[in-house]
């Protein structure tokens, strides 16, 4: 697949992260590591990783308007479909491949995770928890529970995935869960790796650090 690469042309913008998972992800990334952010949006996470730990970060984003936003901020991005472009990268191209709220938008999540494990030495995934107790109450009331706070008719398709669902998938695919951090209202809780029921019920989201 032909895609357009836009390289860094200016200083990385200095903007405070707006999401709690960004801070957790930044603590998981080693200083100076190479990073590929899948579905990087406006590049806020790339900027944070570059600024906070000197990461050699680049993004992959399908939306051309968001790519332009990244370029305006002096960030290195590749424009193209994530699942197709991932297959084009050589094995072990990056220290980390990151899905920050983008994994649930993948058309083929299993294949996307497999390719990420091939391309990256480690994979970081932050997932919105569809199994949160508030979402369960909404379903009991006959309502569709939004995964990210948006109306169900707005934005790209997002797959309903609980914390336990993702952990099960990762283990089925022979990934090791190095650590997993639950977040509620943007604030991290106690790390978990094996005991999932509490996070599956109470966490708004969780960030997983995986090794293939």
Question: Where does each model-flagged region fall?
Answer:
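Class I SAM-dependent methyltransferase "Motif I" SAM/SAH-binding loop
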Residues: 39-41
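A short acidic, Gly/Pro-enriched loop at the edge of an enzyme's catalytic core
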Residues: 88-96
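Conserved alpha-helix/loop element of class I SAM-dependent methyltransferases that forms part
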Residues: 16-32
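A short SAM/SAH-binding and catalytic strip from SAM-dependent methyltransferases
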Residues: 96-107
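S-adenosyl-L-methionine-dependent methyltransferase catalytic module, highlighting the catalytic core
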Residues: 110-118, 122-212
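Class I SAM-dependent methyltransferase Rossmann-like catalytic core
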Residues: 3-17
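Class I SAM-dependent methyltransferase SAM/SAH-binding core
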Residues: 44, 48-85
